[in-house]
Regions:
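A short acidic, helix-capping loop that chelates divalent metal ions and anchors anionic groups
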Residues: 10-15, 78-84, 200, 269-272
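Conserved, mostly hydrophobic/aromatic
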Residues: 3, 27, 42, 57, ...
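Conserved short secondary-structure transition element at the edge of the structured enzyme core
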Residues: 133, 194, 224-278
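Active-site beta-loop-alpha junctions enriched in small/polar residues
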Residues: 6-8, 45-47, 74-78, 113-116, ...
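Glycine/proline-rich, positively charged
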Residues: 14, 19, 81-170, 177
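Glycine-rich, positively charged active-site loop/lid region within alpha/beta enzyme cores that binds
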Residues: 4-18, 183-239, 258
């Protein structure tokens, strides 16, 4: 399990929400709690909170000096309105240096291309990543938010070792190509958005307004397609089985091919993920839950 730090100092990479999300004090408390629970891999990105997330993680690293911490960061998105974005080699070189400075470390264990850049050939991207490996700035590299064709191009171009995509009961597109490719080539598959913006927590109810401060009141665009009776039918079926958040995590964790990036806003939100680790689903239970989401398998 990996601690997602995307809400530190913002809400993901959206410039409109930079400066929101968790404060430094709240972020430090969350990292302390995760570390105490045995979560030793933290995931961030240069654009999360416009650099605030990396800065907060760096403050934790400098003040706690943890032994055995592993770090992932990513690049692609602009760090402010009007700034550049993409995976051009000169930008990647610049961004890793500024990321390392904010994080207060001399290298990260994993560096991800945060999105596909159609203007940068996969071989060119692999080349600059290999350069960073040789320089000791990154341990390994991978891609994020890619489809099957983009992943095949990457695999043909270099030694990409990890993929991080959205995956949940409400977003199963990766089952078609990406997950099988990862299994075939031995790639580490990491899941972001395991609760689909809170939809798998039970907070969104049929014919009721979204709770104030939830993703559906702040940034509903990626989730509007879920406002559908078929979605609510599946969610209600999940709730009849038990705590939906724990079950959503357990469904993912029952697949041994993957790791889950958990991004709590409060310390107590770590508990369902930890409970899922302690109470694994059988293959039969996972299959039964999968069958309850047949009409929302594609987002």
């Amino acid at each position: 399990m990996i601690l997602g730090c995307g809400n530190f100092g913002g809400i993901g990479s959206a410039p409109a929400f930079f400066g929101q999300g968790e404060t430094l004090e709240q972020a430090l408390d969350l990292m302390d709690a995760a570390w105490e629970k045995g979560i030793t891999w933290f995931d961030t990105a240069d654009a999360y909170g416009g650099g605030r997330s990396e800065t907060f993680v760096g403050e934790w690293v400098r003040s706690r000096r943890p032994d055995g911490l592993r770090l992932t960061t990513k690049t692609f998105n602009p760090m402010a309105e009007g700034e550049d974005h993409g995976l051009a080699p000169e930008r990647v070189r610049r961004q890793i240096d500024t990321s390392l400075e904010r994080l207060g470390v001399d290298h990260v264990d994993l560096y991800l291309a945060h999105a596909h850049d159609p203007d940068v050939p996969a071989a060119e991207l692999a080349g600059v990543f290999e350069e960073l490996v040789a320089a000791g700035k990154i341990g390994a590299y991978g891609v994020s938010n890619v489809d099957g064709a983009q992943l095949r191009d990457a695999l043909a171009a270099g030694s990409f070792s990890a993929v991080q995509n959205s995956y949940s009961l409400l977003d199963r597109e990766v089952e078609n190509e990406v997950l099988p490719l990862c299994a075939e080539h031995g790639l580490w598959f990491q899941v972001h958005s395991p609760l689909m913006g809170g939809w798998l927590t039970g907070k969104y109810r049929r014919d009721e307004p979204a709770p104030e401060g939830s993703r559906m009141t702040l940034r509903s665009g990626p989730y509007e397609h879920l406002r559908d009776d078929r979605t609510y039918d599946s969610l209600e079926a999940l709730e009849r089985r038990g705590d939906p958040t724990t079950l959503a995590f357990a469904w993912l964790l029952a697949d041994e091919r993957i790791s889950v990036v958990v991004g709590p806003r409060r310390i107590e939100q770590l508990e369902p993920a930890l409970a899922a680790l302690a109470q694994p689903l059988s293959a039969e239970e996972r299959e039964a839950i999968s069958a309850e989401f047949p009409l929302v398998a594609q987002s």
